[in-house]
Amino acid sequence: MINYITAPFKWFFKLEAASGLILLIAAIIALLWSNSSVGYLYFDILNTHFSIGIKNFILDLSVLHWINDVLMAVFFFVVTLEIKREFIQGELSRPKQALLPIIGAVGGMAVPAAIYIIINLETGYTLKGWAIPSATDIAFSIGVLSLLGSRVPISLKIFLTALAIIDDLGAIIIIAFFYSTELQYTFLLLMLLSFLILIFLNKLGFRRFFPYFFIGILLWFFTHGSGIHSTISGVLLACAIPHKNSEKG
């Protein structure tokens, strides 16, 4: 099913060359616009609310949250599918190769956090921000890589993408455990139940698209309601998607 949903990894990065440039241009425009005399319009747009749903089932989010919670969940889903393929049958399929980005990501989180703590030891109120330097912006990481095109070996792109994903997941876990004060445990249990159902369908060899799609939406909804960042739902869904260890899978 992975091959059905997404194209091969090399093809993914060929398309990313164009999108990386668009991402860079969009970031520059956003920086200039938000710091200009009409910057208030930029923030007004981000804070504009849009709703979808019927009757009592309505999802009302600002443009900012549609981007951060919905579109980024889809982004994490697609990228995690690609990395999952590499862990199963690609560049990261051997244990030693798979361990390298994991170690790199852990070091990339621990070292900046440690430096921050050392610098801010004497100021108690700023010490609470130790998790800030541990995060990586995965979208920009992949965007910068894509700008280099074929000049960067595909194995290096895979490694850095895996490292960025693991680093981002680590940051989400840190936020969930150390910064989330209002976790909704009912939603957390429903999120876990949805994920277990997806895993069960996978183990049964069930490969139809719509059950995964429908339960995936529920998984996102429960994750969003739990107080954990919604992007984790994209990662969990990608992990549960069936994969056949062959090019025809």
Question: What spans do the regions from the language model cover?
Answer:
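Transmembrane alpha-helix boundary signature
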Residues: 33-45, 58-67, 78-94, 110-131
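C-terminal ends of transmembrane helices
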Residues: 6-10, 77-93, 142-153, 196-207, ...
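Structural signature of hydrophobic alpha-helical transmembrane segments
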Residues: 65-76, 124-139, 180-193, 231-233
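Entry/N-cap segments of selected transmembrane alpha helices
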Residues: 86-113, 184-193
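The feature identifies polytopic integral membrane transport proteins across all domains of life
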Residues: 94-103, 123-135, 152-162
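Predominantly late transmembrane helices and immediately cytosolic-facing juxtamembrane segments
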Residues: 1-15, 35, 208-218, 222, ...
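Short helical (or helix-break) motifs at transmembrane helix termini and adjacent helical loops
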Residues: 111-112, 133-159, 167-173
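Hydrophobic core segments of alpha-helical transmembrane domains in multi-pass membrane transport
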Residues: 22-34, 75-81, 111-113, 194-200, ...
